[in-house]
């Protein structure tokens, strides 16, 4: 019986080696294992033939079968390692990552130049005793105009083109709406900064936009005078520009101050020689200012017989244009990284 089983063992061995040479993938190898080593495979068929072998020959035949099983298992394991390595290399070649190449540059974010300037202005004025207050961008006609001495039919309302949402609701045209609320909620002395966006229905040019940022400073107490306004403004500009700035105060009209004036500084872009920013005058208007009108104090619940105050407001974009030598306000809103990445902290 040994002679009848031995040829079968040799036949299975040869068939295994032949099939093994055809295997190209781990999936094909798994199918080969099932064919020869599985529960219904060729090797299991040999084990069933043991019952037909003479009892004294069974140990020897069983040894041959086990040797064949070990032979198959070793060859399968060896080929499996080779195929796994081959498939991994193929995948790496398909998804090539050259570790010797430099990594992708990570750009460090930075604050927008307007945000940098706003932070600097708030820092300076906070050191001078002012506290920061904020207010709504969308406000009522009452807080934007009426309480600030703009009666419903006042001709001064025509000075500013306004974005109206409804007949009595609008996008604020200045941050003075914060001053109005501060007077209602606080008793003098009041010393606040009112920063934020404001909106004007204007033509977009190199010097004007439909929205911009404004900072307003308000000081209300007993015996506040023009001398306090001039001293505060000059000290603020000196700290902001880090040098003594030549200023010019011109009489002007604003409904919420009396008397009113405009503050000009010598153009730092052209050093007073004339450029697009200063309209070739050598001067740039940076603020509107004045002593708070008695009617405004009265509307805010403050007795103008006992208290006085000053207020000034300035456009942030124009200040930054001076600080940075920028001649077009539109650059601030174009989100061009080539422009924005030029600026380090002030």
From Swiss-Prot:
Gene3D superfamilies cross-referenced by the UniProt entry: Bira Bifunctional Protein, Domain 2
InterPro entries on file: aa-tRNA-synth_II (IPR006195), aa-tRNA-synth_II/BPL/LPL (IPR045864), Phe-tRNA-synth_IIc_asu (IPR004529), Phe-tRNA_ligase_II_N (IPR004188), Phe_tRNA_ligase_alpha1_bac (IPR022911), Phenylalanyl-tRNA_Synthase (IPR002319), tRNA-bd_arm (IPR010978)
Residue numbers binding Mg(2+): 258
Location within or outside the cell: Cytoplasm
Enzyme's top EC category: ligase
SUPFAM superfamilies: Class II aaRS and biotin synthetases, tRNA-binding arm
An MF annotation (GO) of this entry: phenylalanine-tRNA ligase activity
Cofactor: Mg(2+)
A single BP term in Gene Ontology: phenylalanyl-tRNA aminoacylation
The keyword RNA-binding appears for this protein: no
Pfam (any one): tRNA-synt_2d
CC per GO annotation: cytoplasm
Catalytic activity, as annotated: tRNA(Phe) + L-phenylalanine + ATP = L-phenylalanyl-tRNA(Phe) + AMP + diphosphate + H(+)
Keyword Membrane: no
Keywords in alphabetical order: Aminoacyl-tRNA synthetase, ATP-binding, Cytoplasm, Ligase, Magnesium, Metal-binding, Nucleotide-binding, Protein biosynthesis
E.C. no: 6.1.1.20
Co-factor binding comment: Binds 2 magnesium ions per tetramer.
PANTHER family in UniProt: PHENYLALANINE--TRNA LIGASE, MITOCHONDRIAL, PHENYLALANYL-TRNA SYNTHETASE
Subunit structure: Tetramer of two alpha and two beta subunits.
NCBIfam families found in the cross-reference section: pheS
UniProt family annotation: Belongs to the class-II aminoacyl-tRNA synthetase family. Phe-tRNA synthetase alpha subunit type 1 subfamily.
Protein name: Phenylalanine--tRNA ligase alpha subunit
Gene (name only): pheS
């Amino acid at each position: 019986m040994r002679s009848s089983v031995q040829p079968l063992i040799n036949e299975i061995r040869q068939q295994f080696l032949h099939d093994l040479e055809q295997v190209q993938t781990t999936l094909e190898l798994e199918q080969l294992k099932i064919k020869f080593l599985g529960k219904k495979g060729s090797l299991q068929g040999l084990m069933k033939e043991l019952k037909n072998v003479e009892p004294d020959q069974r140990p020897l035949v069983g040894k041959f079968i086990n040797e064949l099983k070990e032979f198959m298992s070793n060859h399968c394991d060896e080929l499996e390692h080779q195929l796994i390595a081959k498939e991994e290399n193929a995948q790496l070649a398909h998804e090539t990552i050259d570790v010797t190449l430099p990594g992708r540059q990570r750009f460090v974010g930075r604050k927008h130049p307007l945000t940098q300037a706003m932070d600097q202005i708030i820092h300076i004025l906070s050191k001078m005793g002012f506290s920061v207050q904020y207010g709504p961008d969308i406000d009522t006609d009452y807080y934007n105009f009426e309480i600030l001495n703009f009666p419903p039919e006042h001709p001064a309302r025509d000075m500013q083109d306004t974005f109206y949402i409804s007949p009595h609701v609008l996008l604020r045209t200045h941050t003075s709406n914060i001053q109005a609320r501060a007077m209602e909620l606080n008793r003098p002395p009041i010393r606040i900064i009112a920063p934020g966006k404001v909106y004007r229905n204007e033509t977009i040019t190199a010097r004007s936009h439909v929205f911009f940022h404004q900072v307003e400073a308000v000081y209300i107490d007993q015996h506040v005078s023009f001398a306090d306004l001039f001293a505060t403004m000059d000290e603020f500009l000196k700290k902001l520009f880090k040098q003594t700035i030549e200023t010019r105060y011109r009489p002007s009209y604003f409904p919420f101050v009396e008397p009113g004036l405009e503050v000009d500084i010598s153009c730092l872009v052209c050093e007073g020689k004339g450029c697009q920013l200063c309209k070739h005058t050598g001067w740039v208007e940076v603020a509107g200012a004045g002593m708070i009108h008695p009617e405004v104090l009265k509307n805010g619940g403050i007795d103008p017989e006992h208290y006085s105050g000053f207020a000034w407001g300035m456009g942030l974009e124009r200040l930054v244009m001076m600080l940075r030598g920028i001649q077009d306000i539109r650059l601030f809103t174009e989100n061009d990284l080539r422009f924005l990445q030029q600026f380090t902290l002030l």
